Amino acid sequence: MPFLSDMLDQSRRQQDEEQALARENLAEASLLQAHLSHRSALRSRFRFDPAAVMDCLRAEVLGQDPALQAVEDMLKVVRADIADPRRPLFSALFLGPTGVGKTEIVRALARALHGDAEGFCRVDMNTLSQEHYAAALTGAPPGYVGAKEGTTLLEQDKLDGSPGRPGIVLFDELEKASPEVVHALLNVLDNGLLRVASGERTYHFRNTLVFMTSNLCAHEIQRYDERRQRLPWRLLPVGGERRRRDIDGMVRARLLKTFSPEFVNRLDSVVTFNWIERDVVARLVELEVQRLNRRLEKHRCRLEATPEVLAKIARAGFDRQFGARALRRSVRHHLEVPLAEHLLDHHQPGDGNCTTYLASLEHERVRFVRR
């Protein structure tokens, strides 16, 4: 019967299409399983996306490409889990003047990896400048009070990090530490361990990113740039590579005068941060406004600023010697204080909707209008 024959042919075609689709799905599933197996092998210890972490860092740290490149290279090695297991995952010394982002890059990294800008162990080396204060890091010797307690400056849980993510420790202002403390750090860089003086406890840094900061060479670099600016333009070196080589030479010479060659030689990376320039300051102002808006979320309001306001803050906040800290003072004086006064006098919580305020210049003063 023609009708039944057509139905049978249609059923066969449908069955063939379903079988072909099933074969395609099986092939795709096999490829997906192989892809996941490959990824899971790399995820056996660390589970984070280096590209996503770097996106967070580049949004927070501006004008410091060499430092960001060093951190990106480090993240790839750590994520692939091919770092030397007998040493810290990574060790770096960040050099440069104040207010250029040496500590901020560590905060941004902690925020990206652990969701908390304070999710790292920070040791202020300024408090360890005297020999008798070294016990705060290395622990009290045997027979002294607190010998079995270890150091009060390190938290092992922050050194270990969170599941699938490395820990972070920052030794701030390294040049101010006593020689005994630097010698203890030599052992940390060498084998990833810090044994307290009593021998009762050992701190492990083998799952840790070790960062150190220092203001060494800041004055030398400033004088170098000032001499360059006084030269006739015909005598100025062409390009920035010459400046980079000169500064690297100055930094290395100063490092070897301050620290032992054994210590410097065990660092994975030494990065000199750039001065904050005018073009970077303009972008930093926008970043500070974004941070202010995050703090305003709890009040259900947000801030928008005209280009004139942003330019005024950038002009007042540009100070090459003091970097971003001078900019933050400008933001506080020209934006946060007037905004706080306006909110205290005029802000009325709405019905749950977000209130937007526009900051504009009026007779060189910042005024706010509700939009």
Curated annotation (Swiss-Prot):
<dbReference type="Pfam" id="PF07724">
    <property type="entry name" value="AAA_2"/>
</dbReference>
<dbReference type="GO" id="GO:0005524">
    <property type="term" value="F:ATP binding"/>
</dbReference>
<dbReference type="InterPro" id="IPR050130">
    <property type="entry name" value="ClpA_ClpB"/>
</dbReference>
<dbReference type="InterPro" id="IPR003959">
    <property type="entry name" value="ATPase_AAA_core"/>
</dbReference>
<keyword id="KW-0547">Nucleotide-binding</keyword>
<feature type="binding site">
    <location>
        <begin position="96"/>
        <end position="103"/>
    </location>
    <ligand>
        <name>ATP</name>
    </ligand>
</feature>
<dbReference type="InterPro" id="IPR019489">
    <property type="entry name" value="Clp_ATPase_C"/>
</dbReference>
<dbReference type="Pfam" id="PF10431">
    <property type="entry name" value="ClpB_D2-small"/>
</dbReference>
<keyword id="KW-0143">Chaperone</keyword>
<dbReference type="GO" id="GO:0034605">
    <property type="term" value="P:cellular response to heat"/>
</dbReference>
<dbReference type="GO" id="GO:0005737">
    <property type="term" value="C:cytoplasm"/>
</dbReference>
<dbReference type="InterPro" id="IPR003593">
    <property type="entry name" value="AAA+_ATPase"/>
</dbReference>
<comment type="function">
    <text>Unlikely to encode a regulatory protein. Has ATPase activity. AmiB and AmiS may act jointly into a two component ABC transporter system.</text>
</comment>
<dbReference type="InterPro" id="IPR001270">
    <property type="entry name" value="ClpA/B"/>
</dbReference>
<dbReference type="InterPro" id="IPR027417">
    <property type="entry name" value="P-loop_NTPase"/>
</dbReference>
<dbReference type="GO" id="GO:0016887">
    <property type="term" value="F:ATP hydrolysis activity"/>
</dbReference>
<comment type="similarity">
    <text>Belongs to the ClpX chaperone family.</text>
</comment>
<protein>
    <recommendedName>
        <fullName>ATP-dependent protease ATP-binding subunit-like protein AmiB</fullName>
    </recommendedName>
</protein>
<keyword id="KW-0067">ATP-binding</keyword>
